[in-house]
Amino acid sequence: MRIDPAEFRARPLRVHALLHDVPLEDVWAGPLAGGGAGRTVQDLRAVMVAGREEAPAVVQGLFRLRSRIGTVFGWDHQRPAWNAESYADRLSPADRARSLVAPGTPDGSFRILYRFEDEQLSELRNATVHAFASLSIRQTPGGYLAYLGVFVQPVHRLTRLYMGAIAPFRRLVVYPAIIRTMQSAWAKRYGGGSAVG
């Protein structure tokens, strides 16, 4: 479900300070039943990757269409100056020491800036947007609650036009499907676990 950004901003996450000047585009959350104690964002990311093939055909079709359009218009070519454009230089030594993976590690179309036990921030830079995906998890009485926050930094004057054009697809189809697929994959792996206190 799409939630009030204020709820997300109230969470004690590193992303709020790191991306203090980047607009927050969307925030979604999904309850995850069971799982037992000690689950982390790494566990959440693992079930999301495992559930990719179960994504609805319409969502897979939209991603394929976006990929083809990006190829035609040259939107998604690797940029040689990625490191210079990355927000990785905003990471403190403490952030780097705490991260479970090295900044710049590929994660699908994104690159991970950091992955803590309860929070991950990934970055995507192409010719249309400079986007960031914040994934976090917290315990609840019945299991866990996962948050997906999307930040977008315009790269030119057409970025907002582009984001506006794809907003209905993102909000009505893509994000709800991501949450449902995540919940389904979580239930398959952890649904039998005991609820968290």
Which stretches of residues belong to each language-model region?
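Hydrophobic-ligand binding "helix-grip"
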Residues: A97-T140
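Intrinsic-disorder/low-complexity, polar/charged segments enriched in Ser/Thr/Lys/Arg/Asp/Glu/Gln
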Residues: E25-A29, E119, L145-Y147
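Beta-strand/loop substructures that line and gate deep hydrophobic ligand-binding cavities in soluble
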Residues: N126-G164
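Hydrophobic ligand-binding cavity/cleft-lining segments
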Residues: M1-A94
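Short linear elements at protein peripheries
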Residues: A29, A81-R115, G193-G197
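A conserved amphipathic terminal alpha-helix motif
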Residues: L161-G193, G197
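Short C-terminal domain-edge/linker segments immediately following a structured domain
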Residues: V59-L62, V152-P154, A177-S184
